[in-house]
Amino acid sequence: MISALILKSMLSIADTSLFINILNLSSELRDICGFTTVPNASQFSRFKIKFEKDLKNFFDYLVEITDPICDEINSYLNDILIVDTTGIEAYVNENNPKKFDTLLRQCKALSKNNPTFNAHSFACSKMPKVSYANPDIKLSYMNGHYCYALKTSIVTNGLGIIRDIDFLNDKSTNITEAATASEAKDTYDSKSLIPTLNKFFSKHDFKYKYFLGDAGFDAVDNYKYLYKDKNIIPIIPLRRAPSSPMPGFNENGVPTCPNDNKLLMKFDGITREKGRSDRIKWICPKSKKTRINGKTQYILTCENPCTTSKCGKIYQVPIDNNIRMHTVIPRNSSKWNNLYKTRTIIERTNFMMKYPLALQYTKLNNTESLKSEVILSAITQLIVVLIANNMNNTQNILSIKKVIS
């Protein structure tokens, strides 16, 4: 049965009835699936409901055996951990985006006469918080619109290969308390990261150097968890820059020259000493670090130095002072920007799961069935990684059709 479900994903067939008809017409496909007779639709459905946890265990096993392959393909990208949240829209009556949009327009018309009236929160309060058919299907803001979906966190490496899937059931997030749709999503994202990664690291003893996440994960607790607890460098943009930066710093937490606040000091590495917290070392922007006779020296070219030191001003900033602003890799530096560009690979993975693997077109509203479909999509990707590795065709690991064609 599992072979048939993986084949169904590979062929981008969302409808089980259509897949059954194809199996009835093709003896070759029946042989691949190991069927002498084709199961009916209810047998497929019962399998997904009954064996959802077993499918997850199988997926976790595939994650373990594909990690060395990912490391062999590109060890640098395999040292990068990426997390994104998404939602699998269920086949429920409430999933009509026009309904919320119409309600929001009506509320915005009311707010014209009352500037303190929050149209977004009021519109959300009038919508059912969960689907009548299944309370696990909740009102969410996903993929640019409101819908009723099974919320999911996807974890990948820098290659876009799925490392974990987590179905969070966070009851502490109230979508009606958010002032905007994006704020509602960011609030959910910020609270989902630590539980998701705790589950992931409890199953896999993997080590990562960098974490990439969008601005939704910009929360102090997330920085502390990643850097202090997991020894992972977080690469996360600010959700919103401080309205008034700290004196002597710009909006990204970079110290400025005392004589010219438009002149940013230069990053010069991390200072680590036993018994002291890690510190970011910044040097004068007009000081050049060089090697002379085997020794490191600084050459200062400033005409109006702010210090008598021959190397110019040096500023050591403890990371613990403000772990969100004082990032190990300076925010918006060339290294930070190059790393963050890699984050878009998870968007490709989400797209692949929903469209080439037909997850977006499933007509399901049962929790276990929806979870099984998501897990099967991830299993299919990892099976393709194994096939591509055996075929020495790893450059196409994110293109299922190219690998199996």
Residue ranges of each PLM-predicted region?
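An internal, acidic/charged active-site-proximal segment
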Residues: T180-E183, T187-N293, P330
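Basic, short loop/linker segments at the boundary and entry of helix-turn-helix/winged-helix-like folds
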Residues: M1-L11
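Basic, amphipathic alpha-helical segments enriched in Lys/Arg and hydrophobic/aromatic residues
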Residues: N338-S405
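Polybasic low-complexity intrinsically disordered regions
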Residues: R46, K50-F211, A215-K228, R239
